Amino acid sequence: MSKPLKVLCLHGWIQSGPVFSKKMGSVQKYLSKYAELHFPTGPVVADEEADPNDEEEKKRLAALGGEQNGGKFGWFEVEDFKNTYGSWDESLECINQYMQEKGPFDGLIGFSQGAGIGAMLAQMLQPGQPPNPYVQHPPFKFVVFVGGFRAEKPEFDHFYNPKLTTPSLHIAGTSDTLVPLARSKQLVERCENAHVLLHPGQHIVPQQAVYKTGIRDFMFSAPTKEPTKHPRDLTMIVAVSSPNLGIGKKNSMPWHIKQEMAYFANVTSSTESSGQLEEGKSKIMNVVIMGRSCYDSLPKKNRPLKDRINIVITRNSNYNFGLTKKEKMPENLYAADCIDSALDLVAEKYGADSDIQVGKVFIIGGSFLYGSALYHPLTKNLLFTRIHKEYPCDSFFPFEPAESSDWVRKAHPELEKFVGIPVEEGRLKAASSNKEEVEIEFELYGKNDDVNVALEKLSIC
């Protein structure tokens, strides 16, 4: 088994490492299933005390998330609830020592002041930056900023130039009065690969499932090693129970609809829209990338999926595809530990010496891999089969594309051109295996990669 991700978690003002771990609540418990979370304590002693006669000041101090007996520390000095940014260099040296002892770390989660110092830290460590006297550590693969902000003093501008290129997820509260959306927006503007999740709360780490899975999916969208040197556009293809966005139950599909299954097979097999066959190649084959549980759920007679290159994403280096010792390894079936590794494997196995030309690359599930692909910079398209019936499910697609500003629905002619086969338009009557009549609809969405879309989410109306 490969090692789990290691994540550096930086607390906010008047907190400590243990307090932040506790304040993360169910998020910490959930993420700990997938990663090692480490919680250092800042070196700045916070002596902030509220005037006992000032209720507003008491509420504001409580909102910062400290605990009476939990220790009160920070990463910057503060006066009258405003960051002076004193001791920032001491804090970086403290973090550096912790990283040398406990690291290296794959990524960072920072809350409030922890996000503020974390943004500086990530920028100093990103590729292409000159050596600095404060921190020595490999670049982070991802950063998550909750209630994050940019230091507003001009002497700190060098921490935001050039822009942070490390993939960043910004989680901000629409009711946050301590770090308003306008301040979070200033940080997003200095991040080149930014994603934004908004929650309706105040200055907190939101506990709802969508944010827990969002952080997890974002962390695992980062490549386990170097980003692929052989980029190809990725297309997610999924059938979804609407409106609950269910995609499975007990690791199997809760419906069996002939038209839906035929559409999936035809689209992922068709190479009509993959261009001309190159000289020296005998055929074009598409790639289907899936999670281990998704592959294991396929009927054995259908594994691997015929006439397609199958790649299973698993961190188990001993995964054997469910084969017995006597069974021969099928052709065009491989394992990789992440999407980027899968693309590198495709380039290695189907290069100039191969007679097979690679067509489209599809992400076919399950929910964990969909979540990772959602944040992957190479994901450009989503083929969304909407089943207009709500089935009981225990796994779900991570978002509704029709309600997302990051995705734009394409016209039906564009759908047909993209898949290369005729597709019926609108809501179609179909029958499930138990003769129950349902309606299905085939949709195509294109991803909007413009960072201004993320900034629009943080606009103040």
From Swiss-Prot:
Substrate binds at residues 260-265, 308. Its EC number is 1.5.1.3. GO terms for biological process: dihydrofolate metabolic process; folic acid metabolic process; one-carbon metabolic process; tetrahydrofolate biosynthetic process. Residues 233-447 form the DHFR domain. PROSITE patterns: DHFR_1, DHFR_2. Disulfide bonds: none annotated. One of its GO terms (molecular function) is lysophospholipase activity. Transmembrane segments: none annotated. Keywords: ATP-binding, NADP, Nucleotide-binding, One-carbon metabolism, Oxidoreductase. Pathway: Cofactor biosynthesis; tetrahydrofolate biosynthesis; 5,6,7,8-tetrahydrofolate from 7,8-dihydrofolate: step 1/1. It comes from the Eukaryota. Pfam families: DHFR_1, FSH1. It catalyses: (6S)-5,6,7,8-tetrahydrofolate + NADP(+) = 7,8-dihydrofolate + NADPH + H(+). NADP(+) binds at residues 239, 246-252, 292-294, 314-316, 365-372. GO terms for cellular component: cytosol; mitochondrion. Key enzyme in folate metabolism. Catalyzes an essential reaction for de novo glycine and purine synthesis, and for DNA precursor synthesis. Belongs to the dihydrofolate reductase family. This is Dihydrofolate reductase. The lineage of its organism: Eukaryota, Fungi, Dikarya, Ascomycota, Taphrinomycotina.
